[in-house]
């Protein structure tokens, strides 16, 4: 039986992870769960899965949780709680918390020799070199939960990495595919949150609308698969049936296809390298799949993807700046403080102003993250 800790169990990926685990109760034991604010849902999860330990935002949330529960469970709090919970006896830590908050707990879990199922983008975007060096040193598995990276992992299995010509990440194009800059000047938050294919959290949905999500995935792919950025391409595939592809040096292309359901890559990360039948899963019906189309991304309109490639090429703390500026800019947009196109403008401005640190420590990364966010917040949150 695999012992599992889920960081961010009340979010989109966390709830779907527990949904998958419900199908395989005999294979998994939930050791720990964490939530930020959603004490009500966490209470239900505790009753259903009986974890030994949980962590919440602060002591107020901990007190709310104690009032909700009749059972005795250890409750940790704050960022220290996230770091402490991964030290408990477990085989796998699912990192589904959003933001830079996931970085130190992930590093701590790796140092403890635990395998990682990674759904947090910031970990590799900001500290890819540090994290992957540690993964190799500790000889643990770091498995992607993203559908695109899971697809690439599956397409690479059984093949020699030296034979890879390029990785091809697919993008749906988001709700504004085909639009030009002029069309996007006055788009609303609701329009940007209306993703055509995937049901996700608000932050990642906006990142999909700007194509920054795909930019983050390019950065993650470099570190996950140890490949240079000039061998990672992005293609827009509106149907979201092909989740990514690997092209080999003989011209062959291997693709992974599936319905747009996050439970598939979650299941693969939980059970790797085996596969099991998932109850309630919709299988592809090729008789209903009338076409698979592809187009180049519009880098002029969707500047965020270009900025991600640029940050990756520069390296060092520039990817931390990219991530921090995006996080604040998206928050400003969601709170109707800025317009949609200003997201890319704020990120580009932050990158231009940054004095890059080429070989950063974890402290450098966390400090740069805080500095960038504070600077943008001061300027726009008046």
From Swiss-Prot:
Q: In which pathway does it act?
A: Isoprenoid biosynthesis; isopentenyl diphosphate biosynthesis via DXP pathway; isopentenyl diphosphate from 1-deoxy-D-xylulose 5-phosphate: step 1/6
Q: Which UniProt keywords apply?
A: Isoprene biosynthesis, Manganese, Metal-binding, NADP, Oxidoreductase
Name the cofactor(s): Mg(2+); Mn(2+)
- Amino-acid positions noted as binding NADPH in the UniProt annotation, renumbered to this chain: 10-13, 38, 120, 122, 201
List residues binding Mn(2+): 146, 148, 217
InterPro entries found in the cross-reference section:
DXP_reductoisomerase, DXP_reductoisomerase_C, DXP_reductoisomerase_N, DXPR_C, DXPR_C_sf, NAD(P)-bd_dom_sf
Q: Which molecular function GO terms apply here?
A: 1-deoxy-D-xylulose-5-phosphate reductoisomerase activity; manganese ion binding; NADPH binding
Name a biological process GO annotation.
isopentenyl diphosphate biosynthetic process, methylerythritol 4-phosphate pathway involved in terpenoid biosynthetic process
Q: Where is 1-deoxy-D-xylulose 5-phosphate bound in this sequence? A: 121, 147-148, 172, 195, 208, 213-214, 217
Q: What class of enzyme is it?
A: oxidoreductase
Origin superkingdom:
Bacteria
Q: What is its EC number?
A: 1.1.1.267
Reactions mediated catalytically: 2-C-methyl-D-erythritol 4-phosphate + NADP(+) = 1-deoxy-D-xylulose 5-phosphate + NADPH + H(+)
What's this chain's function?
Catalyzes the NADPH-dependent rearrangement and reduction of 1-deoxy-D-xylulose-5-phosphate (DXP) to 2-C-methyl-D-erythritol 4-phosphate (MEP).
Which PANTHER family would you find in this protein's record? 1-DEOXY-D-XYLULOSE 5-PHOSPHATE REDUCTOISOMERASE, 1-DEOXY-D-XYLULOSE 5-PHOSPHATE REDUCTOISOMERASE, CHLOROPLASTIC
Which family does the UniProt entry place this protein in?
Belongs to the DXR family.
Protein name, entry field: 1-deoxy-D-xylulose 5-phosphate reductoisomerase
Give the originating organism: Thermoanaerobacter sp. (strain X514)
Q: What is the lineage of its organism?
A: Bacteria, Bacillati, Bacillota, Clostridia, Thermoanaerobacterales
């Amino acid at each position: 039986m695999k012992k599992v800790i889920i960081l961010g169990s009340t979010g989109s990926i966390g709830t779907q992870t527990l949904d998958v685990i419900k199908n395989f109760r005999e294979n998994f034991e939930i050791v720990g769960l964490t939530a930020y604010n959603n004490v009500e849902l966490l209470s239900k999860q505790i009753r259903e899965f009986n974890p030994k330990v949980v962590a919440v935002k602060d002591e107020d949330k901990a007190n709310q949780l104690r009032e909700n529960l009749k059972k005795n469970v250890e409750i940790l709090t704050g960022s220290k709680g996230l770091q402490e919970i991964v030290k408990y006896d477990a085989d796998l830590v699912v990192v589904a918390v959003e933001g830079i908050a996931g970085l130190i707990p992930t590093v701590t879990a790796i140092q403890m020799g635990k395998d990682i199922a990674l759904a947090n983008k910031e970990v590799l975007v900001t500290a890819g070199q540090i994290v992957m060096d540690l993964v190799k040193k500790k000889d643990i598995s770091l498995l992607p939960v993203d559908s695109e990276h899971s697809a690439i992992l599956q397409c690479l299995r059984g093949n020699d990495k030296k034979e890879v010509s390029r990785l091809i990440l697919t993008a749906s194009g988001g709700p504004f595919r085909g639009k030009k800059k002029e069309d996007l000047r006055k788009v609303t938050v609701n329009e940007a949150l209306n993703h055509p294919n995937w049901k996700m959290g608000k932050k990642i949905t906006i990142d999909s609308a700007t194509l920054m999500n795909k930019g983050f995935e390019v950065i993650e792919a470099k570190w996950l698969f140890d490949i240079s950025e000039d061998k990672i391409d992005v293609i827009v595939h509106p149907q979201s049936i092909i989740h990514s592809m690997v092209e080999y040096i003989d011209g062959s292309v291997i693709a992974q296809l599936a319905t747009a359901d996050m439970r598939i890559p979650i299941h693969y990360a939980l059970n790797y390298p085996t596969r099991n039948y998932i109850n309630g899963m919709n299988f592809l019906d090729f008789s209903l799949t009338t076409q698979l189309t592809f187009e180049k991304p519009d880098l002029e309109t969707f500047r965020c993807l270009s900025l991600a490639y640029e940050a990756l090429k520069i390296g060092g703390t520039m990817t931390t700046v990219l991530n921090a500026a995006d996080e604040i800019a998206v928050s400003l947009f969601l709170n109707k403080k800025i317009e949609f196109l200003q997201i890319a403008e704020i990120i580009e401005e932050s990158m231009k102003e940054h004095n890059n640190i080429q070989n950063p420590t974890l402290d450098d990364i966390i400090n740069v993250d805080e500095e960038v966010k504070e600077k943008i917040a001061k300027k726009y949150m008046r």
